[in-house]
Every structure is written in structure tokens, then in C-alpha cells.
Amino acid sequence: MKITDLTLIPASKYLFVKIITDTGISGIGEVGAWGFIDAAAECLKKFRGYLVGKDPFQIEHHNQYMYRSMYFRGAILMSAISAIDIALWDIKGKVLGVPVYELLGGRTRDKVRSYGAVFQFTPEAMAKGCLELKKQGFTCARLMITGDMSQTQTGMEDDIFNGKVKKYTDMVAACRQAVGEDFDFVLECHRSLTPSEAIAFGNAVEKYHPLFLEDPIAPDNVEVMADVASKISIPIATGERCNNIQEMELIMTKKAARYVRPDVCALGGITPAKKVAAMAEANYVGIVPHNPLGPVSTAACLQLDASIPNFTIQEFPSFYLQGGEAAMLKEPLEVEHGYIKVPNRPGIGIELIDDISEKFPPKQRGINAQINYDGSVRDL
């Protein structure tokens, strides 16, 4: 069996990849470089020249070859490799007639606990959003603590240390009061806090027992993240920006997080994500896969989640729950009580509809940063 072609499928804000073999069996993957999918597309076109004529079963070899063939790597290149890796696993599972998780060591669970996101930004509205998720059966909500990323301007109140910490703490307090104790929170900070703010906020919300604090500060300096982690009792989750296993390993050895967030569409695919899970298991670190993308990303995450012992919870995009992107699939994923059923179909368990690019026209994402009240730029 040989690879005969690699084609690109743009749809909505996503870029999917289809790898075709001479048997007629094909696999699908997804690019994680959202906002820069045009650049990733050029990488994929170059990798097509390498892949055509190759055996699709040599997944580790192809991953290593593409990774080591470039002097300069980074997010765009690794997103392209990720899409290819996922598609190759999809092919292998389909040819052998088994789900990918069977090729990764077998199933460790039948369903995957997930959390939905609350896209409201006042204490009252956030509490209402949590109640709605609980009504749907979810047992965990992602709270967008530091505000709406689509807003480009912050207010003067965000310059006041005590006011900012109190505002964010009030959000968590309102949500806890609304839903009671039998519900978890994930506190998404989007890298927007300073270390001092992160420590003060973490200590202020300790009594509400959030599951974890996600990316409280910019993750570029692991030593500083570790310092923040040492000064609060709430676990930190980070790692979504990592593009190789070495970056993930550093987070764990520096004790910067108790949960790591591999992105199968940015790290290099399922292949390195499985390695990260093994590293994390040895360090008693939980896996919370990053997944803000499309349905192929979700399906690939489920295969990883189903095959590892240290899975914690799965990010599940709320826009899928609202019905829009479920229509991208021939057979939608099943969600019940906040748990996603792991598909038992061969490969990654899903197929995109044939006319996906027509029903979901491609969109471009512009350059968007947030501006502080004084005119300076803040992290997004």
C-alpha cells in the first residue's frame, strides 16, 4: 500500500487534510495553526512531495523524518506535521479495521469526561452559564476569567491590582454559589495575569476549589510559572503552545504544572502526544488535551484519551454543542451527561461530509491583540 495524494480541505476557520492511498482508503487530519492556516498549507504542499509513494503505516518514521528534515521548526511546521500524523493513524486504523486507540495499547475507558465553556463575562451571567451547562449534564465548566478575547480594548479598572483580583474572584464566587459543591471549574486566564496577580488570585479563590488554573501567566518562562505554582495550592494547567515533547518535559521536571495540555494538532500529532502522556504518568501529572479546534481535532483527542491511564478531562468546544459544527460530520459524536462516547468505528472514528467546504465556507482570522487602557499591548 502506498500514499498517492495529499489534499487540503478548508472549511470555516479550519484546515483539514486528506491523505489518499492506492487502496482507495483515505485518512483525515487537522491543522492546529489557527489564524495562519495559509502558511501551514504551504508546508503541507511541500510534505506532499515526500509522502507520495511512501508506506502510510510507517507513522513514527514519517513523523521523525518530517520533524528532523527542517533546520527551523515552530508552530506552523508542527501543525502541518500534526495533521499528517493524525491522517496516517486514521488510515492505519481503517485498514486494520480497528479504532486508533486499539493501536495505542487498547481502550482504558468507554467515555470521556469533558467540560464546556461559559462565554459570559460578568458574575451573574457566568453563574447562569454554569447552571445551563449543569442542566445539560456537564460536571465541569471553563470560566473565561480574564474576559472576552474578541474585545480589543480593556478598561481602566484592569489597571487596579486589587480591583482586578476582586473582579475575578467575584466571578468564581458567584458560580460556586449558583451550582453548589458537586461541580468543577476550570479557570481560563489566557496568559493575561502578571505573576503577582496570578498568585493573589490563586490564593483568593482557593476556598472555591477550582480544578485548575489554566495559563495564569505567559508560558514562555517555565521557571516563573513554576514559581507561581509553588506559591498557590490550586493546580496549574499549561502546555497548549508546546510544539515538541522536550518543551512538555521541561514543564514537568520544573514542576510548573500538575496538568499538561498537549494539542494533538500542534504538538506533532497523536504520536508525540502519546509520548507526553507516558512522561506525565511517570510524574503523576494529569492529561487535559487542548482542543479549541474542529471535529477532527476532537476525534483525535478521544483516541488519545481512551488509550491512556492518566487522562483527566477533555476540552470540548461549545460551538460543537450548539449544533453548528456537528453538521461537519457524517455521524456526529455522542455526548451524554457531559461525557463524550468514544467511537468504536475504525480509524479516528469520524468522516467529514463530502461538501464541507461549500456548507462551511473558509474564513480568515485577522491579527488581533488586546490593548490596555494606557495604549500598551497585553498578551492574548
Q: Where does each model-flagged region fall?
A:
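Structured beta-strand/loop patches that form or line metal/cofactor-binding pockets in enzymes
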Residues: M1-I28, G32, F319-A326, I367, ...
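Metal-dependent enolase-superfamily TIM-barrel catalytic cores that perform enediolate-based chemistry
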Residues: K111-K231
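Metal- or metallocofactor-binding catalytic centers and their adjacent structured scaffolds
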Residues: I20-L96
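Proline-centered loop/turn at the N-terminus of a beta-strand
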Residues: P99, R113, D184, P235, ...
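Conserved, mostly hydrophobic/aromatic
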Residues: I3, G24, F47, I84, ...
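Extended hydrophobic packing segments that form well-structured cores
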Residues: I348-L380
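Shared catalytic-loop signature of beta/alpha-barrel
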Residues: E42-G49, H61, N203, H209-F212, ...
